Amino acid sequence: MKLSCGFLLILLVLSAMIATFSEVEAMKPSKPKCGLCRYRCCSGGCSSGKCVNGACDCSGRSDLNDELEKYQ
């Protein structure tokens, strides 16, 4: 009886640890997609960057901010 209670206790602790780890992994933010231009991954939002491997890359597109200022 003691052996089965100990085994159940260990099983319960392990399942609680796995559940906690799964929640922590699910709460990690994912990389912003370029389609979500409201997400500010660059200084001017995603529209000031370019899409590289499904993520916003902020290098090389600062000219868009200058063009926007000229337009306004």
Swiss-Prot record:
UniProt keywords, alphabetically: Disulfide bond, Ion channel impairing toxin, Knottin, Potassium channel impairing toxin, Secreted, Signal, Toxin, Voltage-gated potassium channel impairing toxin
Database matches in InterPro entries: Scorpion_toxin-like_sf
Signal peptide (from-to): 1-30
Location of this chain's protein in the cell: Secreted
Propeptide residue interval(s): 60-72
Highest taxon listed in the record's lineage: Eukaryota
Disulfide-bonded cysteines: C34-C42, C37-C58, C41-C51, C46-C56
Molecular function terms, GO-annotated: potassium channel regulator activity; toxin activity
Tissue expression per record: Expressed by the venom gland.
Cellular-component GO terms for this entry: extracellular region
Key word Secreted present: yes
Annotated function: Potassium channel blocker. At 3 uM, this toxin blocks voltage-independently voltage-gated potassium channels rKv1.2/KCNA2 (25%), hKv1.3/KCNA3 (27%), rKv4.2/KCND2 (25%), Kv10.1/KCNH1/EAG1 (15%), Kv11/hERG (12%), and Shaker-IR (10%). On hKv1.3/KCNA3, the IC(50) is 17.1 +-3.3 uM.
Family designation: Belongs to the short scorpion toxin superfamily. Potassium channel inhibitor family. Epsilon-KTx 01 subfamily.
Note in the entry: Negative results: does not block all sodium channels tested and several potassium channels. Does not block the following voltage-gated potassium channels: rKv1.1/KCNA1, rKv1.1/KCNA1, rKv1.5/KCNA5, rKv1.6/KCNA6, rKv2.1/KCNB1, hKv3.1/KCNC1, and Kv7.2/KCNQ2. Does not block the following voltage-gated sodium channels: rNav1.1/SCN1A, rNav1.4/SCN4A, hNav1.5/SCN5A, mNav1.6/SCN8A, and DmNav1/para.
UniProt comment concerning the protein's domains: The presence of a 'disulfide through disulfide knot' structurally defines this protein as a knottin. Is completely devoid of the classical secondary structure elements (alpha-helix and/or beta-strand).
Protein name: Potassium channel toxin epsilon-KTx 1.1
Organism: Tityus serrulatus (Brazilian scorpion)
